[in-house]
Amino acid sequence: MGSGWHEWPLVIFTVFGQCVAGALIVMGFVWLKENDDKARMRIVRSLFFLWLVMGIGFMASVLHLGSPLRAFNSLNRVGASALSNEIAAGSIFFAVGGFWWLVSVIGKMPPALGKIWLVVSQILGIVFVWAMIRVYQIETVPTWYTGYTTLSFFLTMVLAGPLLAALLLRVANVTFKSTLAASVSALALIVCVAVVVLQSNTLGTIQSSIQQANALLPDYGSLQVWRIALLAAGLGCWICPLIRRQEPKTLGLFAGVALVALGELIGRGLFYGLHMTAGLAIAG
């Protein structure tokens, strides 16, 4: 019962990780297309904040596990355990992407190798998100064992990632024609609304011998409304200036990132609050 916030370390880890993966894809493409070496270096420097966010996410995951030693022990079953695969995928993404950033920021990365390394890092980010999804594809948890889980995790990456990238590129004073990225995020919001509606209907059909799924979160509907409102307001801070053919302001983009992040944190809390088993036991 509740809002699922009792799993706040996992809420932060998954949302932050997906945001970083999405932002790296956008910022990486801008870096690859940029011909000005000075602008490229400003992009690289601004990427520091991505890895800072990723570091916060990993610290939250360690709090969930209890100690760093448990995180290392969980790697013992890579290939056989979805949790081990998630930690391994996240660690590799963090290490490969972080090392690319470190070598690039000190100016020691060869140009050709740097491009390949960055693309590999972007792909590893997608693999990391997919590994997260596999952790929650549990047959005995019918509220999670659906395509909505896959959609929701990737939607977070598409909703929050490009907006975070737009903010960091603005801070770096790099020209970013963000109409396409903003359109993709707006489309993701529409899909997100559809997922909420369809999943709400599905919850009414899921039950165990002692519990119905739609009774797990009595405030599910109202919290989802707040979540969608926050997402719409956050994206509006980015999209409205573009509609007026103006460059979004740094403060507006920062507010947008904060609103979208809050909305996705609420949504992920609801996800964990929907945990129920197919047997007699109910968790959450």
Question: What are these model-predicted stretches?
Answer:
Residues 41-42, 79-84, 114:
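Interfacial loop-to-helix junctions that mark the boundaries of transmembrane helices
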Residues 1-10, 62-84, 133-150, 199-223, ...:
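Membrane-interface interhelical loops and short amphipathic "cap" helices
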